[in-house]
């Protein structure tokens, strides 16, 4: 009994730095942000600690509400395309032999060795009118005149896909790698076609990984304002851009905090939906 008690005491002491770190750098900033969202802005960068709901009411104004709608549209479009591209990559990556899996993981992680901003500036060279993409398309005879892709909505979607696609691939890969392929083989032996076996077995069992990838791509794509700034030419204003603008030029920290709180609530709701769906799937599997 004494040994068990000593072990539990030592474990508690070892976890103490983690608790302190979480409280100081996560809990306290969140409390401050939520409190700030109910404060009243004053001139300059000042804040008057007077309770108000105006910051949240302002979000419902057409100009700000439209920003949320546009951000949701962009996030939804980007996530669908990323899922359609990322799922097959993650699935086939899990089917590779062990020595090739490591090479594939290395190639997938390679872009993270370079800063995202630098990589996005590379896309400016590719997407501009005299860029590589238009050059290749014209040489192949697919187009006669160069396309105006840069500083447009499609350019932002391309940037989102480029930055966030690895997260989807790794999420699907981690889920597909744990899949017991004997279930698929059993379905095939019982007369199911490859397509039927995929939708009834593979897709259902890898759904948690797909949903995890959706969360890892949908939520950031609403706030990655630097992609919209670089590839979109400020034609699309995201929630992240709005928060940055209110924190700097707008000098309205309480309103920026309110926007951040709404984003945090949206993220929490998505995670709760994900957990509910995955738990339901696990219960179905047990049943």
PLM feature segments, named:
Residues 7-42, 57-146, 150-177, 201-225, ...:
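Membrane-water interface segments at the C-terminal ends of transmembrane alpha-helices
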Residues 45-50, 125, 225-251, 287:
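Glycine-rich helix-loop "coupling/hinge" segments at transmembrane-helix boundaries
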Residues 179-183, 283:
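Short glycine/proline-centered loop/turn elements that form peptide/ligand docking sites
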Residues 187:
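The alpha-helix within a helix-turn-helix
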Residues 190-191, 204:
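Glycine/proline-centered hinge or cleavage motifs at structural transition points of membrane proteins
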Residues 276-287:
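Short cytosolic juxtamembrane segments of multi-pass membrane proteins
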């Amino acid at each position: 009994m004494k040994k068990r008690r000593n072990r539990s005491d030592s474990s508690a002491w070892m976890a103490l730095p983690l608790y302190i770190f979480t409280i100081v750098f996560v809990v306290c900033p969140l409390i401050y942000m939520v409190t700030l969202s109910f404060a009243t802005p004053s001139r300059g960068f000042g804040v008057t600690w007077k309770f108000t709901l105006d910051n949240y009411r302002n979000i419902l104004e057409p100009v700000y509400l439209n920003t949320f709608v546009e951000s949701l549209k962009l996030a939804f479009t980007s996530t669908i395309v990323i899922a359609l591209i990322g799922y097959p990559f993650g699935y086939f990556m899990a089917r590779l032999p062990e020595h090739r899996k490591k090479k594939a993981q290395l190639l997938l992680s390679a872009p993270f060795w370079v800063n995202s901003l630098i990589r996005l500036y590379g896309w400016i060279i590719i997407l501009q009118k005299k860029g590589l993409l238009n050059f290749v398309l014209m040489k192949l005879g697919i187009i006669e005149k160069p396309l105006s892709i840069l500083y447009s909505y499609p350019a932002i979607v391309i940037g989102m896909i480029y930055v966030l696609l690895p997260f989807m691939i790794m999420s699907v890969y981690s889920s597909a790698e744990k899949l017991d392929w004997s279930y698929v083989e059993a379905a095939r032996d019982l007369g199911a076609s490859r397509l039927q076996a995929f939708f009834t077995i593979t897709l259902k069992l890898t759904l948690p990984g797909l949903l995890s990838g959706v969360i890892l791509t949908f939520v950031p794509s609403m706030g990655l304002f630097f992609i919209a700034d670089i590839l979109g030419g400020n034609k699309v204003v995201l929630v992240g851009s709005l928060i940055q603008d209110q924190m700097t030029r707008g000098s309205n920290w309480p309103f920026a905090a309110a926007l951040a709180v709404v984003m945090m609530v949206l993220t929490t709701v998505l995670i709760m939906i994900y957990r509910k769906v995955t738990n339901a799937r696990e219960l179905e599997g047990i049943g």
